[in-house]
Regions:
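Intrinsic low-complexity/disordered segments
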Residues: 2-3, 23, 83, 101
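Short, surface-exposed linear segments at secondary-structure transitions and domain or protein termini
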Residues: 68-74, 92-97, 169-177
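An aromatic-rich alpha-helical recognition segment common to small helix-rich domains
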Residues: 86, 143, 152, 169-180
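Short helix-coil boundary/hinge micro-motifs
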Residues: 2, 12-78
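Short arginine-rich
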Residues: 178-189
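Short, cationic Gly/His-enriched loop motifs
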Residues: 40, 45, 55, 79-158
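A short, exposed loop/beta-hairpin motif centered on an aromatic-Gly-Thr core
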Residues: 159-169
Length: 189
């Protein structure tokens, strides 16, 4: 297993003078003042889009769309620091960096309208999953092939609840969605 695979899901911590540790996210946020961000970028909360306010290089001109897609999200490099656009949108709208994770309520990773963003815990953010993982053979969230039928299962606070065996994956998925709406506060499906 590579170091990158081992570190996935764990915040990368950096030791600084005095023995304290900070995550790379904390260091990145502290490295740039909001005034600098506001000088360089303009955010439209209704569209969720950032534009450059001034020319920063030969490639970046005033009025150009800011950011590049990366795994469905938009990332913006400002003064040498790479920021997720949804974190910048939160900062521009609330005046503060998010305390936890920013969740896209409608599940569209590139939709950075402020009405689509919320600051939630990692657990709640994970509860807003809308699609089955790529390795799920049934193609339905919360459903596994089980003998000659399909079983639905849901997890909350580390505890798995069995939702029954069903003849079709659609019926098992319907049972999962019903339980998800009742159990998961982050659920928006």
């Amino acid at each position: 297993m590579s170091l990158r695979q081992q570190a996935r899901g764990k915040p990368c911590m950096v030791r600084i003078d005095g023995g304290t540790t900070k995550s790379k996210t904390q260091l990145r946020r502290q490295a740039i003042q909001f005034d600098q961000l506001a000088e360089a970028l303009q955010y439209n909360p209704q569209s969720g889009v950032f534009h450059w306010k001034k020319r920063l290089s030969n490639c970046i001109h005033a009025g150009d769309l800011a950011g590049n897609p990366h795994r469905g999200y938009v990332r913006i490099r400002v003064f040498g620091h790479l920021f997720p656009a949804h974190e910048l949108a939160w900062r521009f709208s609330s005046g503060e960096w998010p305390e936890q994770e920013i969740d896209h309520i409608n599940g569209i990773k590139s939709d950075n309208r402020i009405c689509n963003l919320r600051d939630v815990s990692h657990a709640v953010n994970g509860q807003n999953q809308r699609k089955a993982r790529r390795d799920n053979k049934t193609g339905f969230l919360g459903v596994i092939a089980y003998g000659d039928g399909y079983a639905a299962k849901i997890m909350k606070n580390g505890k798995t609840t069995y939702l029954g065996k069903h003849r079709t994956p659609e019926k098992a998925h319907a049972a999962y969605v019903k339980a998800k709406r009742a159990l998961h506060e982050g659920c928006s499906i």
